Amino acid sequence: MLFACAYSLHGQTTYTDGVFILNEDWYGHNNSTLNFIRPDHPTDPFEYYIIQNNESNAGQSLGATAQFGAVYGDYLFIISKQDQDAGDGLSPGESAETRQGGRIVVTDAQTMEIKSRIPIIRANEKGVSIADGRSFVGVDETKGYVGTSNGIYILSFSPFEITGRIEGTENPLITGDEDNADGVGPLYQNQIGMMLRTADYVFAIQQDKGVLVIDPQTDKIIHTVEGCFSTMTQSKDGNIWVGRNTNMDYQHYPYGNMGSSGECWEGKELLRIDPETFETEAVPMTEGGINQTWYAWTAGSLCASTQENALYFTYNENRWSWFTTSKLYKFDIDTRTFTQIYDSATDKRYFYGAGIRIHPLDDQIYGALYLDNVVQSYWIYQMDNQGQVLKELEPIDRYWFPALFIFPDNYAPEVEELPDVTLEDGAVEIDLGSKATDKDNLDAAIVKTVKSNSNEDVVEARIRNHRLTLQPKAVGEADLVIRFNSNGKYVDRTLHVKSLTTGIRHTEESPVRVWGKDGRIHIKGLQRPTHVLVYDTDGRQIRNTVLSPGDCIEGLPGGKCYILKFNRKQYKLIY
């Protein structure tokens, strides 16, 4: 059985045996809330208000209109649009001044004890907030990124504090003095949406700009997949998927002429992005579609199974309403087949907010449904991966407005021991992708890094696309510590390397030639795996890679000038 009884940690209830449901809750009356569901509990599957009711969190709560949360490592990160709902006063005599929230709230992932609360992410010179919360992604053991209405911010974990904003992600329209009451102002433009961490990069949607590719080592944008997109996920095979607006006449918010309704958005295409080359493939949606999520931003329903190569999403064909979404679809990636697997309209119930998520352990779908905005009746559906309803759970009556399901992360990655390596004649490449797996996360998203090298004079070690390249530099031995980080939980393995060669070939090297053809940059004359840096004409680094003889660079836009640097030389190319 997947769900068992809760247990205590030093006298505290722990939340590892069920599913979190993050609620916007009743805007204008109180801050957002977090409930916990144990579907197999014999009498009461719901535990309510687990943040506010935690004795360790006296006087603290989530912010107003929370839309996103994620477990990363030992912490749960919850992002709200505002820090405080002016109507929050849950007890007689209690006011908003006595229960403080935050746009960023960090809790212990097991006990829900608040560890940090950040009310303002960025302020203008008057102290007015100019960055409302949107999303979060864990980057490594030291930091995460926070998506907002005004850029992507770097969140340090020790201590929990904002240390900067990623250049090129800002919203130049926001000053703190604008009026957004009409629903089409600066707050609703240039927003950051969903973000994902892959093995080598961070992908983030910026409204109407495209998918930004960020180097997590430098915190800089290295590539942009241009376009008008909504919501994003990563599939079991490692590819990135976004919903694409196919109405080329309305590529900018509000996607129509009728205020903020977005009636001209046509999300009839998925775009697949290769996580390493950034090559794209447009996949027409023969059934269903992807609704835009920018007005009253939500995380969107598009999500991926960790058990099979499939995506799930809900879709509302009525472009004039966000509140009557009833159809649930499955996309089989391998067969490129779209199938409607459920329709809740027969019960006059509708998916709310992000609507659905897939449990990583048993592949069951969790759906949040309601009647409409003025009725306090809600249901949590537990479904199999073919859309068959297994269980209906009904919480107490309240204006919950559920935003997102969040699953505990109970397992660290399982990593094989690494056998010793002897370098006899040149570089050796080792596939690390097959060395690690994680029961409750995507294997394709496990980040591999070289944490230490006991003798850098003997061997140079680099990891890219799950592959470790060992380049001998001198005769000798070295111990490498390779870290496998899966969603903030990590395992280290030691690799012993013995080099019997200097790695220097004494034959005359062929002349190097660089040229572009068929959307690829080719380099002829490489004698060994070579570290290649690619810059644009403004001096921005846009690619950092290791090429073996015969490899080429893909995914760079044509018609531009590039500068390549390798082997202490510089090459200029236009293709």
Residue ranges with predicted function:
Residues 368-412:
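Blade-level signature of beta-propeller repeat domains, shared across WD40, Kelch, NHL, RCC1
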Residues 505-575:
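C-terminal outer-membrane/trafficking sorting elements
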Residues 476-488, 495:
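A short beta-strand micro-motif common to beta-rich folds, especially ectodomain repeats
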Residues 409-424, 440-445, 496-520, 526, ...:
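Residue-level detector of functionally pivotal "anchor" positions at catalytic/ligand-binding pockets or at interdomain
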Residues 488-501, 571-573:
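C-terminal edge beta-strand
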